[in-house]
Design a protein with these regions (language model features):
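Short, structured segments at the rim of ligand-binding sites
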Residues: 1-416
Length: 416
């Protein structure tokens, strides 16, 4: 089993470029099925989740190949409209292929998806959206059997602004007859990036970034070239790493407007944050201080994917910080591992109370999920001694080269 070793206590300094957004790449790869043509997706991060999505496309009959950091997908010919359990269980977001396959083929058969265990994450909203468009779905026995002789545009009102359900509805609506209006849509930047890709293929989609998205199908769609947006969660991770370790770090290839909720909190914690076109700079020279309660929320609120990472950065802050996890029920699995390093954290239900401690000590810890694993690495940068993070397969689902990027900033970190 591979692991990361971190020798803490070294401030971070320098510049690093942020990878493309994983949460943009995955739905965009699913969307290539709608083109029936060649698409080039530029700036794709080399991640295990991206490899899993590429393997799904190959299984369906697409030709997929890497060209540097670009992925070329030729979906001219589909030979299958089903995805087996072995592929579906490799990542949670594999369910995003459902809407695209249904729009292209008129039927789809998928098992339930896998991914990080963060408590119940039902796909009921996805299925309700597809049923509203006219799909007949049988979800008995752990397999989704979906048929739609004809998808029909309609108004879809999501009970909550689910990112995945919004994306699935957008993709399926591209194959429907008539206009579809998605209300209470997720507003994440990755939704706007998916809209940009669909429009580049010739679709008429508008409203992404707001709570109402309208899809007016145009066929046939065609291939295109598209560059994905920077990964805001990776950028937030490196900002939190610099906050934890101290120093001065500049991130290139990033969009500071997507990170306002995170940079605001880091500023409250005592970091100096300066933003400009394509970059964010963070300076931390003095001690960190506790911040007002951090409540996770859909975008533009504080992202749930940054909760564990910010918590790790504030373990030594002066005072007490309260975290309230409003998105997932089981997203404090990293807390026992941080406690092994000397963190003072109490949890009850959706609430975690972090009392700043003077010292963290390195030890052996285990990543239990993607962002929790990144949080352990952030804590290791601030700890005294050596921290070993096991289970880095979780981390590699979302970070193309976490160790390499941190090493470029001066961290004493190795991957073995």
């Amino acid at each position: 089993m591979r692991y990361i070793t971190i020798e803490g206590g070294t401030p971070l300094r320098g510049e690093v470029a942020v990878q493309g957004a994983k949460n943009s790449v995955l739905p965009i790869l699913a969307a290539t099925l709608l083109s029936g043509d060649m698409c080039r997706i530029e700036g794709c991060p080399h991640l295990s989740d991206v490899d899993s999505a590429a393997d799904i496309l190959r299984y369906l009959g697409c030709a997929v190949q890497w060209d540097g950091d670009d992925l070329l997908v030729d979906s001219t010919t589909l030979t299958r409209c089903d995805i087996p359990q072995t592929l579906m269980r490799r990542m949670r977001s594999s369910v995003i292929f459902l809407g695209a396959i249904l729009a292209r083929c008129g039927w789809a058969e998928l098992s339930y998806p896998g991914g990080c265990e963060l408590g119940p994450r039902p796909i009921d909203l996805h299925l309700a959206a597809l049923r509203a468009l006219g799909a007949d779905i049988d979800d008995a026995g752990g397999t989704l059997r979906c048929r739609a002789r004809r998808l029909t545009g309609c108004q879809i009102v999501l009970a909550t602004p689910s990112v995945g359900a919004t994306e699935n509805a957008m993709l399926a609506a591209c194959g429907a007859e008539g206009e579809t209006v998605i209300c209470n849509a997720a507003r994440e930047p990755e939704i706007a990036d998916l809209q940009a890709f669909l429009c580049a293929m010739g679709a008429e989609v508008r409203g992404a970034g707001g709570s109402v998205i309208t899809v007016s199908p145009k066929r046939p769609l065609h291939g295109c070239v598209h560059r994905v947006i920077p990964d805001r969660i990776v950028a937030a991770t490196y900002l939190c790493a610099a906050a934890a370790a101290g120093g001065e770090v500049t991130l290139r290839n990033t969009e500071h407007r997507h990170l306002a909720a995170v940079t605001t909190v880091l500023d409250q914690a005592g970091c100096g944050v300066r933003c400009g076109e394509g970059y964010i700079q963070l300076v931390r020279t003095g001690p960190l201080r506790a911040v007002p309660p951090v409540r996770t929320a859909p975008y533009p609120g504080f992202p749930t994917d940054c909760q564990a990472i910010l918590m790790a950065a504030l373990l030594q802050a002066q005072g007490t910080t309260v975290f309230v996890e409003n998105i997932f029920q089981s997203r404090y699995r990293h807390v026992p591992e941080l406690a092994r390093m000397g963190a003072d954290i109490r949890t009850e239900g959706r609430v975690a109370v972090v009392c700043g401690t003077e010292r963290l000590h390195g030890t052996e810890v285990v990543a239990t999920d993607l962002r929790g694993g990144a949080a352990l690495a952030v804590a290791g940068l601030a700890a005294e001694g050596v921290t070993t993070v096991q289970g880095i397969g979780h981390i590699q689902r979302g970070y193309a080269d976490l160790a390499g990027d941190l090493r470029a900033l001066g961290a004493r970190i190795t991957e073995q």
